[in-house]
Amino acid sequence: MHQVVCATTNPAKIQAILQAFHEIFGEGSCHIASVAVESGVPEQPFGSEETRAGARNRVANARRLLPEADFWVAIEAGIDGDSTFSWVVIENTSQRGEARSATLPLPAVILEKVREGEALGPVMSRYTGIDEIGRKEGAIGVFTAGKLTRTSVYHQAVILALSPFHNAVYQPLQA
């Protein structure tokens, strides 16, 4: 059984990770543990590089906390231009897989508050009246009329980031 450490306590992210690992490695093949770790970037990262750095930092911090695991996984959401998205970083003892999620264009009224320094989650909670929306359907669920959620979009990115771990073609070439 794979020991998987999620570098988050966010239920939407944990569910995406759990679903993806079960789909790739089989139902019941993984034990998931979650840990709260720092990202080393602002609460609301801006740009692809800052957001990816946050996910990488979370993985590194989770590895320090639970070094005996088989996989460490982080999902960091950010703002890039006028859209929200996330980076998924997965590591085992010898490899890293990374994938960027789909992006969701955000309305100007939401972006204005985020650019003033507020994190997207609290802005969306005020806009919708849904407490802790970032731990639930997120802006994605709201603006896609529930057709997609944070979990469903993150799930796809986790599946993509897992590709190097179950496809031999990703293994380094032997010299």
Curated annotation (Swiss-Prot):
**One annotated GO molecular function:** ribonucleoside triphosphate phosphatase activity
Give the EC number.
Answer: 3.6.1.73
Instruction: Supply the enzyme class, top level.
Output: hydrolase
Q: Which domain of life is it from?
A: Bacteria
Q: Which residues participate in Mg(2+) binding?
A: 38, 68
Tell me which residues bind substrate.
Answer: 8-13, 68-69
Q: How does it assemble?
A: Homodimer.
Record protein name field: Inosine/xanthosine triphosphatase
What organism is recorded for this protein? Escherichia coli O45:K1 (strain S88 / ExPEC)
